[in-house]
Amino acid sequence: MDNELLSVRELEPSEHPMVSAWARAHGCGKFDPRLLPANRFFAVCVDGNPVMVAALHFLVGVGVAMLDHSFSVPGLSLRNARRASAALVDVASDIAAQNNCGVLQMFVPSGIARVAKTLGFQEQDNNLHFMTKQCL
């Protein structure tokens, strides 16, 4: 993948089982597509095959976009993950700006935070945890 051209496209609903398998492989438990934001879910691809995915959604009225539900294909090297992350962040930043969002945020584990800093993100609080609660 080092010298191959990356492309970014919207993820198809038929690909949700693949994302679920990636989430389990990374120890993230069950991936529930019902928790996806309604805006956009992207895949970074090499030769048309997804290697990383993430969801982008907009917080209404505050000019903030959130990038989350990010997973990579199991076994993706750190070098290739950085490359795919950069492509994903570039596209997400452009779409956020087109939708009048001046800030792109994400909640990530420590390892990804280190990569995110190289992509222009700034750490706001090193004690945040991503939490969900079932209500129905």
Language-model features: locations:
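Residue-level preference for short coil/turn positions at secondary-structure junctions
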Residues: E4, P37-A38, N100
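Acyl-donor binding region in acyl/amide transferases
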Residues: A65-G120
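Terminal substrate-recognition subdomain of acyl/acetyltransferases
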Residues: M1, V46-N49, V60, A97-Q98, ...
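Generic alpha-helical hydrophobic packing signal
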Residues: D2-L6, V44-D47, A86-D90, Q105
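A conserved beta-strand-loop-helix scaffold within acyl/acetyltransferase catalytic domains
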Residues: M18-D47, V51-S72
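Glycine-rich loops and low-complexity Gly/Arg-rich segments
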Residues: D32-L35, R79-A81, D90-D94, H129-K133
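Short amphipathic alpha-helix that is part of the acyltransferase structural core
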Residues: M1-D32, N127
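Short, structured secondary-structure boundary patches
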Residues: P50, A54-L56, A81-R83, D90, ...
